[in-house]
Amino acid sequence: MANSSPVYDWFQERLEIQDIADDFSTKYVPPHVNIFYCLGGITLVCFLIQFATGFAMTFYYKPTVAEAYSSVQYLMTDVSFGWLIRSVHRWSASMMVLMLILHVFRVYLTGGFKRPRELTWVTGVTMAVITVSFGVTGYSLPWDQVGYWAVKIVSGVPAAIPVVGDFMVELLRGGESVGQSTLTRFYSLHTFVMPWLLAVFMLMHFLMIRKQGISGPL
């Protein structure tokens, strides 16, 4: 590149960033692609908003049955723009689920799950399950009446599974009944385990799309 800066030359010599930029900027976009093909990207944006606002709330949230509710109230009433951060987190969560559903329908209706993109579809469905699980675990964290009874009902569902049902219930609750161990496990799942899982499957999803390209029209 003519008249490039020393900083650019330093990175170019080591990482060949121009080749990376050319690869992204010259990627062919099929003529049949329309606005509905942006639904997956919008879902990603919602996830990034979720990550940023969720990270901000961890500075104030206290994952204990005695202080969880009061810490959420403190965030909403006393922290500067805390109400906005939590509201954006909730709104983007709803938007993420909506965009995900529409994205799945778009891919299904346009046949984007067919050979050779079966694994892309599998990773997408896996991410859909993780996203719904985000909603279940996050719903309980304020530890109000709605959150408590939601956890009690959801964690009791596996009891209907033969042989391993009771073990799964105890694994989710951290004991025989819903309590501090349950909240701790749901908090850990919501803020650490699931974000990492989703990030890994997102990377796999994007790499496969990058390799195979966008599916053709029906």
UniProtKB/Swiss-Prot annotation:
One of its GO terms (cellular component) is plasma membrane-derived thylakoid membrane. Keywords: Electron transport, Heme, Iron, Membrane, Metal-binding, Photosynthesis, Thylakoid, Transmembrane, Transmembrane helix, Transport. It is found in: Cellular thylakoid membrane. Its main location: membrane. SUPFAM superfamilies: Transmembrane di-heme cytochromes. Heme b 1 binds at H103, H205. The chain crosses the membrane at residues 35-55, 93-113, 119-139, 189-209. Its cofactor is heme b; heme c. GO terms for biological process: photosynthesis; respiratory electron transport chain. It comes from the Bacteria. Heme c binds at C38. It is a multi-pass membrane protein. Binds 2 heme b groups non-covalently with two histidine residues as axial ligands. Binds one heme group covalently by a single cysteine link with no axial amino acid ligand. This heme was named heme ci. InterPro entries: Cyt_b/b6_N (IPR005797), Cyt_B6_PetB (IPR023530), Cytb/b6-like_sf (IPR027387), Cytochrome_b_N_euk/bac (IPR048259), Di-haem_cyt_TM (IPR016174). Heme b 2 binds at H89, H190. The 4 large subunits of the cytochrome b6-f complex are cytochrome b6, subunit IV (17 kDa polypeptide, PetD), cytochrome f and the Rieske protein, while the 4 small subunits are PetG, PetL, PetM and PetN. The complex functions as a dimer. Belongs to the cytochrome b family. PetB subfamily. Heme 1 (or BH or b566) is high-potential and absorbs at about 566 nm, and heme 2 (or BL or b562) is low-potential and absorbs at about 562 nm. Component of the cytochrome b6-f complex, which mediates electron transfer between photosystem II (PSII) and photosystem I (PSI), cyclic electron flow around PSI, and state transitions. This is Cytochrome b6. The gene is petB.
